[in-house]
Amino acid sequence: MRLNTLSPAAGAKSAAKRVGRGIGSGLGKTAGRGHKGQKSRSGGGVRVGFEGGQMPLKIRLPKFGFTSRRALVSAEVRISELAKVNGDVIDLNALKDANLVTRNIQFAKIVLSGTIERPVTVKGLKVTKGARAAIEAAGGKIEE
């Protein structure tokens, strides 16, 4: 076997269908588009969601909900990620310096996921009940 003798398995490749190339091809004349109508024309077609003038489903259904603007500037931090923070005091700036949250984040909450080995002091961050218990069990404390 040599590189110049390699070829795809039989039946693995099929030639592209050439449309509009005579009656004998099976896809001549109308080229599989049928007769007349918007979809048969060059550049013809309708936008996504268009239902031929009938009121579209997207508009027939009621609006609901909204996008919370606070969610755009809030983040959750796992307790296992706190090991990446240098120093014993963890606040929002320390999380940003450790690249655990992005620069535009204004609120952060520490959640229980994983374990924490060293004692740390958490300042000015929200902490869930489970995370609070884990931090205090490791010898750390939470300051509001």
UniProtKB/Swiss-Prot annotation:
Region Disordered: start-end pairs: 1-49
InterPro entries: Ribosomal_uL15 (IPR030878), Ribosomal_uL15/eL18 (IPR021131), Ribosomal_uL15/eL18_sf (IPR036227), Ribosomal_uL15_bac-type (IPR005749), Ribosomal_uL15_CS (IPR001196)
Top-level lineage group: Bacteria
Compositionally biased tracts (Gly residues): 21-31
Coiled-coil region: none
Region forming the signal peptide: none
Gene Ontology molecular-function annotations: rRNA binding; structural constituent of ribosome
GO process terms (BP): translation
GO cellular component labels: cytosolic large ribosomal subunit
Pfam families for the chain: Ribosomal_L27A
Keyword annotations from UniProtKB, A to Z: Ribonucleoprotein, Ribosomal protein, RNA-binding, rRNA-binding
Gene3D superfamilies per UniProt: 3.100.10.10
Family classification: Belongs to the universal ribosomal protein uL15 family.
Family matches, as PANTHER family: 50S RIBOSOMAL PROTEIN L15, LARGE RIBOSOMAL SUBUNIT PROTEIN UL15M
Function recorded in the entry: Binds to the 23S rRNA.
Subunit details: Part of the 50S ribosomal subunit.
Name of the molecule in the record: Large ribosomal subunit protein uL15
